[in-house]
Amino acid sequence: MKKTIITIIILALSWTSYAQSIIVEDFKPVCDSLTRLIQERTTVKGALKTKAIMKRGNSLDFYFTESLGDLPWYSEDAKWFRNTLKSLFPEEYSQYKLGEIYSRRVAFNRLVTPHLTYEGQPAESSHRIAKFNNGRPLVRKMDSQKFSKGLDGRNIALWQSHGRYYDQRSERWRWQRPCLFQTCEDMFTQSFIIPYLVPMIENAGGYVLMPRERDIQINEIIADNDTTYAGEGGRFIGRYEENGSWTDAGAGFADTKAIYTGTENPFTLGTSRQCNTISSDSRKTAAKIIWNADVPERGEYAVYVSYKTLPKSTTAAHYTVHHLGGETEFVVNQKMGGSTWIYLGTFEFGKDKEGWVSLTNRTPKGYRSEAGTVVTADAVRFGGGIGNIARQRKSQDGEEYAMSVSGMPRSAEAARYWLQWAGTDPKIYSQNEEEDDYKDDYMSRGDWVTWLSGGSAMNPKQEGKRIPIDLSLGFHSDAGVTPNDSIIGTLAIYTLKSEGIQKLPSGENRMTSREFADIVQSQIVNDIRAQHDSLWSRRQIWDRAYRESRTPSCPSMLLELLSHQNFADMKYGLDPAFRFTVGRAVYKGMLKYLSNRYGVPYAVQPLPVEDISVSFGQKSKAVIKWRKKLDPIEPTAAPTGYIIYTRVDEGAFDNGKVIETPMEKDGLMSVEIDIMPGHIYSFRLAAFNDGGKSFPSEVVSIGIPEEGDSEKNVLIVNNFDRISGPAYFDTPNYAGFDNTLDSGVPHIKDIAFIGEMYQNRRKLDWMSDDNPGFGASFDDKAGIPVAGNSFDYAAVHGKAILKAGYGFSSCSNEAFCNDTTLCSGAWTVDLICGKQLTVTDARGHQNFTIFTSQMQDAIRRHTANGGNVIVSGAYIGTDIWDLVYPVRIEKDFRQQSIEFAQNVLGYKWQGGFASKKARIVPYGDTATRAIEFHNVQNSDVYCVEAPDGIAPASSSAQTILRYEDTGVSAGIKNQGNGYRTVCLGFPIETLKNEDDIDAILSLCLTFLAE
């Protein structure tokens, strides 16, 4: 009997399975139709598949594979999908109702996420939790603005993908991804995060924690109470000074060795210090520690502090950083984050200038002093440094293998090595018995987030650093190519289950990560389509068990922005403007997700101001004017106030001052600042609102001579606002980037460039990371920043002009064209054209023309009033007579521009690539030393690959400079109708020697003054 029953059950199950398979087969055409319709509706490609279709009474329940969850779903789309699915039922199933829908075992309605919002209010979210108010954040800058609608008090864990690692199998250090299109993923994703995303989060009030070194500075100075190692590789010893009643606080950091091996933890090799706190109004003398930097060369250095977290640690440790721009004060909550590196900020320090960090036991004003608390102190670190973690193949048979360090900046290395240097538990970064650093690296990043948050409200049941992490994001690029060179696009990944559990340690449902991933992906795609490419591909939103999205203790996602293997994607990927757009989109996605999560309003930080200028006012006043820039995508990004930053002479910019009541006229804002003769004053502005502050504007500078001709003032116009990727060529068989033609212009500096591309044959496929086929590039320049457009050349020119005895003011090119008052009283206009050039992006959008119609009109107005002109730039002829990028110039505009150059400025084009050796000599003078300019990429100033030959256009002009190697005319002087011009086919600011800059501008000014 038993056997009979079992047989019947088996047969029934078999029949059920068979019946289901028939139904699934019957619905295949339906799935195909839905796949097409979904793509038409959402633009997302997929292949909808059913795993099972179950009859339940007179209803059909659909169990789709993960293919359903891989698509974005909003409430109206979900409703449309149900209606469309029912309408497509085959005839034989038309009598059935549509029942439940699942993606694997997830109910369809759980996949629905709220739409991206733009009006500043949180969307209704099923994953909203009580607002978490981090009232005592890990790090807070004192006297800084608080952004109630930004990310104030939020802690965000963020990392760029991969990094240099030691491969035990091949016994060498190598990249985790291939070198393609002048970069590799290990370095490429940094170029979005470090210069853009991180400062945007910080400008909104958030604090960023990273498992990879964020500072590209190769020098590293450590000041500590313990003896510190100093040796080769940019490692230097700072000075430690201690005053007051400090006592031993137990084990702490010490840098005792040239290299660290295995899982050695430098935070256990030394000691730390402690002192009882006193209140802000205490009459006791405060105890103090000073860590002196003694930096070896001027530059920007990240500052990290360390301390010990004890049961009675203070929540208000008062640190002060003294740097070239002044002093910046911080309050650090030492109840969390002990025995690791805690980042305060990046500051400019000068060689042989006082630079230090101090810590006092006095509680800062405005912070409550808790009785019986202590402040602790350990080492302070300045600069990122060079990697000092040595690795080797693990011995299996007693044989000793060679040990080596990467030899690269620590910022180029994988997370596994920084985590060791930062005192992380070896269980986090060494999970494979020292046999596989590749696995250790990707396994460590998400686990590190959990280690940081252990013991906090976000992760209360685990031990850790007690830092509440609000969210985490791993920023990657993907592989893959398209046969028609179309865009691969953007993929988002989250993980619904970790160890079979759908809850985060805080109790939240992990489905909140889908909402996070969808919002970030939506924001990226929408912004790219609006600003760069209307056809940008939105890929799927995956629920997959990737380590970086699975193990963090907070809402988390992994982003695959684009394909670093696809040429079409990388045309955008190397464009700094694209990187800014993406960085801003990711920041906005984080902001809007946290708004939904906590149910709080938001405001997007403003864009930088435009039309900026500085001019002479009354009685030694400088008048700074600017225009606010509204964001057409984000209505909440309108500015409500402004901050002005000031630099005097060779100093650094100060911490900024809020402009209380700026004047406004005709849409231009203005403020007056006192200035003194004999000094160069430089200014930049940032706009702010309740959501944060913008990136700084370009720099404008002004100076009044102590002696000289104060009546003859020079207006410096920065007509060099280009930022772009390198020149490229694109044919059916050959394509690539061509740095010999033009290497592009980074924004400030490029940290992604590793070497030039050498393989341009499209048909070559990837064979290995060492032989990656089309796009293959050298990596000999990895870790060396490439200087770009600093937007700070008015001070360079102005310094030479001031030495020559003339005053100067400056403005942007937009301000020069739009504000006719700036030229009034200007004896000469010094037009900085730098490496300005008409360029086009991958979709044909053109920008950065040197002599636009507006610029030509402005110069004509100036010369018509007897004003002189100095023009210098690498492409002042090429951009008129020729082209570098595949741009389209209207015939009438080209002819108009040629006539302008010849008749107004007095020159004609003699050709590009006028010099290979980049050496200039005075015309007709063979005895004078040659003047050199930068023609190869370097870390100091942008380079000029192809200077222009500039010849006299008429008998009223004559050559004054020529290129030494070719004899081609490099510059001319011209006598116009009541005015004079000097035009140079190279940028003055790229000259290698400051004395040469002085000499060239003095030569120009002398002729104009004759």
Which residues does each PLM region occupy?
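A short beta-strand element within beta-rich, extracytoplasmic domains
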Residues: 276, 287-311
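Short beta-strand-plus-loop segments that form exposed binding edges in beta-rich domains
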Residues: 358-373
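Active-site-adjacent mobile loop/cap segments within catalytic or ligand-binding domains
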Residues: 365-368, 379-387, 471-500, 531-599, ...
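Active-site microenvironments of hydrolase-like enzyme catalytic domains
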Residues: 395-399, 412-510, 542-565
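Pro/Thr/Ser/Gly-rich low-complexity, intrinsically disordered linker/stalk tracts
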Residues: 593-636, 677, 691-712
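Beta-strand-rich modules
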Residues: 672-692
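Helical hinge/lid and interdomain linker segments adjacent to catalytic or ligand-binding clefts
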Residues: 754-891, 991
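A glycine-rich, often tryptophan-bearing local segment used as a flexible ligand/cofactor-contacting loop or short
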Residues: 835-944, 955-958, 962-964, 1000
